[in-house]
């Protein structure tokens, strides 16, 4: 077994174990639990070895796209092996065609009458008849498919063997350093599993000059050895203790500046380093082992940004750090609802009656709206420039290449096409084209300014939101022993309703969902729970909003239109989000935790 294959199988087993842990929640409580610390430091542009970095991330990008191409071919071969015709598949196909036809008919009626209120009694009745039939037939199809799978198991095993052989062959010919090769193969393995579970295909990546190079230490690299600059994978020039402990901020800033060298690749078994100026804004624990180190190249607007990421295993006295004596349980209801002070993302209720909420204030919402405004300004400028150019080009005698480049200008939707036209015109000026050139040059300057503004603002507001979520997660995980969340699939909130269920959601609601980014908050909360050894569990979310927490009466109401609701049975007045959090808390205390 090759080194790459053994490493990949080990990581696959780890992913499987992690998946099982996530399904039932996680609870880090043993004294032997290892503590890991992830640190990130800002870097300036490389002073040496940038060509090695670019070479490795380009090769990683190319290998990924080749793996995706081969995986799609493999998936097609599997489908060919598993294809079979039966009475069940024929009936499923007929019913699905009828269902799609009815839904298209509903859409056309709404479009014709320009309203969501149309008489759809007959179509809805037929759809309700088709749905249970389809469900039953698909269950039967699964049983038939399982028999086919068993019958063709050897063929599928052979295809899987061939796929893995192709992966190894592509890896050998990629020219990647072994750490970077493992990084791509591991990402590929995780990506293909996610695509398979979602019923989709893996996606190709567009080359934009971003990526990372990584080094990994299987037994760990002592921090002192890294600062001694003798290791052939990672070196950081040592800094004085004043970089972190001097009372004068200016001295701390000056002393924390140093250089990092990370091995990007090899030549004749000799290391080729990338060197970058780095700011060690916080101390790296001396009694720690470095497990992985990465230099990441990101793009913000028209420029590239670099950072150094370190993952450390804490040793010595800090291995089992003393945590505060946590007690109590808190339940959190997630969502996105506009309130007076901003956008409410979460409501928390604990077992002592305390409640609080997480709100993205109006300043954050204003910044998100400004991003949208800048996009609108760019689009209007683009459309106005197109209209001017089409009129001006009519007055010029254009060569064939210029005619070809501008023939479909009226249908352009991308600013990139206009930038390519600007570049072409700069290199191929024509007699009497001064007005055309002025229009193009004015547009380019304005476009670059607006684009830089938009992308930098986007970067700032996303980082600001993440910091808000981190602070809130850190605060509650240092207070409670158990955190309870509702169990629901976030991607279901993105799916549009079927036509028979009503018109599609409004744009503001969809935009608020994007601004809230519930998945990001949930990830930050999960990370904080792991770090502080807090139990993190899920309970079913069904009916938590419509069930009164005081009397238990279930009553359907328009949850989107009203935040405050009065129970028709007991007369209790409650906020529906806090009500849901109280129901989650009560359910978890009754042993309903998953």
UniProtKB/Swiss-Prot annotation:
Cofactor(s) the protein needs: Mg(2+); Zn(2+)
Instruction: Give the record's cofactor note, including how many are bound.
Output: Binds only 1 Mg(2+) as opposed to 2 usually seen in other Cas12 enzymes; lack of the second Mg(2+) results in loss of target DNA cleavage activity. Binds 1 Zn(2+) within the target nucleic-acid binding (TNB) domain.
Its keywords, alphabetically, are: Antiviral defense, DNA-binding, Magnesium, Metal-binding, RNA-binding, Transcription, Transcription regulation, Zinc
Q: Which GO terms describe its biological process?
A: defense response to virus
Q: Where is this region: Linker?
A: 315-329
Q: Where is this region: RuvC-I?
A: 330-540
Q: Name one GO molecular function term.
A: DNA binding
Q: Does the keyword Transferase apply?
A: no
Q: Where is this region: Recognition domain (REC1-C)?
A: 154-211
Q: Where is this region: Recognition domain (REC2)?
A: 86-153
Which residues take part in binding Mg(2+)? 577
Region Wedge domain (WED): what ranges?
Answer: 212-314
| Annotated stretches, region: RuvC-II | 576-594
Whether Membrane counts among this entry's keywords is no
Q: Where is this region: Target nucleic-acid binding (TNB)?
A: 541-575
Under the heading InterPro entries, the entry gives: Cas12f1-like_TNB
Pfam families in UniProt: Cas12f1-like_TNB
Q: Where is this region: Recognition domain (REC1-N)?
A: 1-85
Report residues binding Zn(2+): 548, 551, 567, 570
Q: What does the UniProt entry state concerning the protein's domains? A: Has a bilobed structure, with a recognition (REC) lobe and nuclease (NUC) lobe. The REC lobe (residues 1-314) is formed by the discontinuous recognition (REC) and wedge (WED) domains, while the NUC lobe (residues 330-594) is formed by the discontinuous RuvC and target nucleic-acid binding (TNB) domains. The crRNA-single-strand target DNA duplex is bound in the central channel between the 2 lobes while the non-target single stranded DNA is bound to pockets in the REC and RuvC domains.
Its job: CRISPR (clustered regularly interspaced short palindromic repeat), is an adaptive immune system that provides protection against mobile genetic elements (viruses, transposable elements and conjugative plasmids). CRISPR clusters contain sequences complementary to antecedent mobile elements and target invading nucleic acids. CRISPR clusters are transcribed and processed into CRISPR RNA (crRNA).
Q: Which family does it belong to?
A: Belongs to the CRISPR-associated DNA-binding protein Cas12m family.
Q: What else is known?
A: Part of a type V-M CRISPR-Cas system.
Protein's name in the database: CRISPR-associated DNA-binding protein Cas12m
Biological source species = Thermanaerosceptrum fracticalcis
Origin organism lineage:
Bacteria, Bacillati, Bacillota, Clostridia, Eubacteriales
